[in-house]
């Protein structure tokens, strides 16, 4: 039998027990002993459910109180000085949570801002970025891994501790203070890995999993050389070592990975099935090969028959050296499909969450040597039925959608006239002042808004009562904006729970789970919608709300939509058609909404593409294809309107230099971006490229409750005006105001409007 193992399991619990315990601990409602007890219960339950599913070698070290990279930072003593409490012997859970969430000014060690958080490769999980200093010292400072190994072994489990590898850990971090090469720290860090491996050996461990996902990236030669040096040094340490790669193919790093002096290599055959034959040919004859055949980051059942073809071939070549696993950690998958008691039976039969994926791995491993076992035959028969159902279901395949896709012409993804002609007509029709002021779309989601939405879903409010409650919120938002003197208004999005879910609920081809939660970071869990079939819009989604808002004012009201790429990136996508096809289907649905908004008298429509840059592939050579279809999808949804209708887009991230040409190719009339935290430095990209359209650089950070002064905003706008012609500048916050409270929102917008008026005065005076 091939060995069945997993690279990691979701830590949040079937009912988000970890989230609830974390938040209770932060509020002081649960003490540390209570929090630790919840952690122990979750780990025990997760090991047992994997074992019951047929997993033979269980991961330990995949549990984290907040984030696995942060756990490693504590383990290695990489704790910034601002979080070191004087007199404490070592880090505590309070240290860990302080690094993740920041520390208030009235705490024992004074105020300290949280560490930076960023995306874990191309997933929707976020990690805490390690902060390295040039004189960084490493020392073993956190016992969690060793305690959990003892815990699992005491329960009778065969374990495989999981470590983030030394090169990946350094790659994920940032140099703070003086600039230096993070690779300079490698020789200081490696002795800690030696200590850890020796201690694990002393605990009776046989195998350790060392995650090096940066092997699927474009690595500089110095980092490739460092891999060889590091693993040659670690070769003398005890334990069998499995280097795990995932999220892509090894490509030019294949030879490097295959020849590292370790005992096994895990490869992702879901993201990069084409690397399989080369790996077998290049790998030394003593090494274990772990095949990632079950998708660890989506919700669809595995095509067991197709996967079994690979397993059989690998078994012939590898014999006992074959292991079977998910493609990556199951952290990115919901926990257990059995919790879903309200899902349509046919749709549910197509899905697999983490527990079900463990069973699929176990079946494939067993099928390698026992192809006629009753359990294997039954699973294969069920899998065949599922694949046949998905291939032929009219719920998935919609002839009308496919015919419309086939009929798309190049001109459908082009505005009728060039920007210079459009903007002249728009300026004449909109009659806005210089430095026009607006917001990004959402206003504070108050407790009364959330209660009304919840009551409506529970049937406690009638539809008429709910509409009136939302109309009341819209009236309030419009009234405040008029009082503040904003130039382009929004309706405030009171009716929207989430910028993707709100639209997905109204599109055919999406389904929603009740318990399909995955961790985004810390206690923040998200429940992505699932795209199961061809996508279309049966009816207008936003028109009545925006039409009502426009009826309340003579000022310009802006329609607010989520773009096709963001809808796709923040959903669980289909696997039977490409992301490009799904983006086009979404673009057509959104296009219909844009056209309907124009017909309702709305003269500005904003189409948010918050996830546009997130969709970039990990390898640069794959960027051009992605950027081509992503920009085309945006233009397709935005190009059904007249020249007089102004299209805005919003992007909230902090790196534009490498995609600026593609952003220009989207051809939005106005782009609003997040720039305040960079002190407008991001605008260099737009200046150097000579970005042709209009720009609204964010003038204050909405992630902080702090109210910026008029003088601060004026200074930022003057800095922006040195880079972007004044006639092309808009004035707006960085992002939506959903998470802020009304008092700070109004105070900040008062200063923003005053700053815009001061700039207009400057302009008039020449």
From Swiss-Prot:
This is 5-methyltetrahydropteroyltriglutamate--homocysteine methyltransferase. Zn(2+) binds at residues 650, 652, 674, 735. Its EC number is 2.1.1.14. One of its GO terms (molecular function) is 5-methyltetrahydropteroyltriglutamate-homocysteine S-methyltransferase activity. Transmembrane segments: none annotated. Belongs to the vitamin-B12 independent methionine synthase family. It catalyses: 5-methyltetrahydropteroyltri-L-glutamate + L-homocysteine = tetrahydropteroyltri-L-glutamate + L-methionine. The lineage of its organism: Bacteria, Pseudomonadati, Pseudomonadota, Gammaproteobacteria, Pseudomonadales. Its cofactor is Zn(2+). HAMAP family: Meth_synth (MF_00172). The gene is metE. CDD domains: CIMS_C_terminal_like, CIMS_N_terminal_like. It comes from Pseudomonas aeruginosa (strain UCBPP-PA14). Gene3D superfamilies: 3.20.20.210. Disulfide bonds: none annotated. It is an enzyme of class 2 (transferase). It comes from the Bacteria. 5-methyltetrahydropteroyltri-L-glutamate binds at residues 16-19, 119, 524-525, 570, 614. The keyword Hydrolase does not apply. Pfam families: Meth_synt_1 (PF08267), Meth_synt_2 (PF01717). GO terms for biological process: methionine biosynthetic process; methylation.
């Amino acid at each position: 039998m091939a060995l069945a193992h997993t690279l990691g399991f979701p830590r949040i619990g079937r009912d988000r027990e970890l989230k609830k315990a974390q938040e209770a601990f932060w509020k002081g409602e649960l003490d540390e002993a209570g929090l630790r007890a919840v952690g122990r219960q979750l780990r025990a339950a997760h090991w047992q459910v994997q074992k019951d599913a047929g997993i033979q070698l269980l991961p330990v070290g995949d549990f984290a109180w907040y984030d696995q990279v942060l756990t490693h930072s504590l383990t290695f003593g990489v704790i910034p000085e601002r979080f070191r409490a004087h007199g404490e012997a070592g880090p505590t859970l309070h240290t860990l949570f302080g690094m993740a969430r920041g520390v208030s000014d009235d705490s024992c060690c004074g105020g300290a801002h949280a560490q930076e958080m960023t995306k874990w490769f191309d997933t929707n999980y976020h990690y805490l970025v390690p902060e390295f200093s040039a004189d960084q010292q490493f020392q073993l400072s956190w016992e969690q891994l060793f305690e959990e190994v003892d815990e699992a072994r005491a329960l009778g489990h065969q374990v495989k501790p999981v470590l983030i590898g030394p090169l990946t850990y350094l790659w994920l971090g940032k140099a703070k203070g003086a600039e230096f090469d993070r690779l300079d720290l490698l020789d200081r860090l490696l002795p800690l890995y030696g200590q850890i491996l020796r201690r694990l050996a002393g605990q009776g461990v046989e195998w350790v999993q060392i995650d090096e996902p940066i092997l699927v990236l474009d690595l500089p030669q110095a980092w490739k050389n460092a891999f060889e040096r590091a693993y040659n040094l670690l070769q003398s340490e005890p334990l069998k070592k499995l280097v795990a790669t995932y999220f892509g193919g090894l490509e030019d790093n294949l030879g490097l990975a295959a020849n590292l002096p370790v005992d096994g290599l895990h490869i992702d055959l879901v993201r990069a099935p084409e690397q399989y034959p080369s790996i077998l040919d290049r790998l030394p004859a003593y090494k274990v090969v772990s095949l990632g055949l079950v998708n660890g980051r989506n919700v669809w059942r595995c095509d067991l028959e197709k996967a079994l073809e690979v397993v059989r071939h690998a078994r012939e070549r590898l014999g006992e050296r074959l292991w079977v696993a998910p493609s990556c950690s199951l952290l990115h998958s919901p926990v257990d499909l059995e919790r879903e008691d309200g899902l349509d039976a046919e749709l549910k039969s197509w899905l697999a969450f983490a527990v079900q994926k463990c069973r699929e791995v176990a079946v494939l491993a067993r099928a390698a040597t026992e192809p006629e076992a009753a359990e294997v035959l039954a699973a294969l028969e069920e899998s065949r039925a599922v694949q046949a159902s998905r291939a032929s279901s009219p719920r998935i395949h919609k002839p009308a959608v496919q015919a419309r896709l086939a009929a798309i012409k190049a001109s459908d993804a082009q505005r009728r006239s060039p920007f210079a002609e459009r903007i002249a007509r728009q300026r004449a029709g909109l009659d806005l002042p210089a430095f026009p002021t607006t917001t990004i779309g959402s206003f504070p989601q108050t407790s009364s808004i959330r209660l009304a939405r919840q009551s409506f879903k529970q049937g406690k409010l009638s539809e008429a009562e709910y509409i009136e409650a939302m109309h009341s919120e819209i009236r309030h938002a419009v009234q405040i904006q008029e009082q503040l003197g904003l130039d382009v208004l929004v309706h405030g999005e009171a009716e929207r729970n989430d910028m993707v879910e709100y639209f997905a609920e109204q599109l055919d081809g999406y389904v929603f789970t009740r318990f399909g939660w995955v961790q985004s970071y810390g206690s923040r869990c998200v429940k992505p919608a699932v795209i199961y079939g061809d996508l279309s819009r049966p009816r207008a989604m936003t028109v009545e709300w925006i039409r009502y808002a426009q009826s309340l004012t003579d000022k310009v009201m802006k329609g607010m939509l989520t773009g096709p790429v963001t809808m796709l990136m923040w959903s669980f996508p289909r696997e039977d058609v490409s992301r490009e096809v799904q983006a086009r289907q979404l673009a057509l649905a959104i296009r219909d909404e844009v056209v309907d908004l124009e017909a309702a008298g709305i003269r500005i429509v904003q189409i948010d593409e918050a996830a546009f840059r997130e969709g970039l592939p990990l390898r640069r050579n794959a960027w051009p294809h992605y950027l081509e279809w992503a920009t085309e999808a945006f233009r397709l949804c935005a190009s059904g309107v007249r020249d007089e209708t102004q299209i805005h887009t919003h992007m909230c991230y902090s790196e534009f230099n490498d995609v600026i040409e593609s952003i220009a190719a989207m051809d939005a009339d106005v782009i609003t971006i997040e720039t305040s935290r960079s002190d407008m430095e991001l605008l260099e990209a737009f200046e150097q490229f000579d970005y042709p359209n209009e720009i609204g650089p964010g003038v204050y950070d909405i992630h902080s409750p702090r109210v910026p002064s008029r003088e601060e905003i004026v200074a930022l706008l003057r800095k922006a005006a040195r880079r972007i012609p004044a006639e092309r500048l808009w004035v707006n916050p960085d992002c939506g105001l959903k998470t802020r409270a009304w008092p700070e929102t109004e105070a900040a917008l008062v200063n923003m409007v005053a700053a815009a008026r001061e700039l207009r005065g400057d302009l008039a005076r020449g």
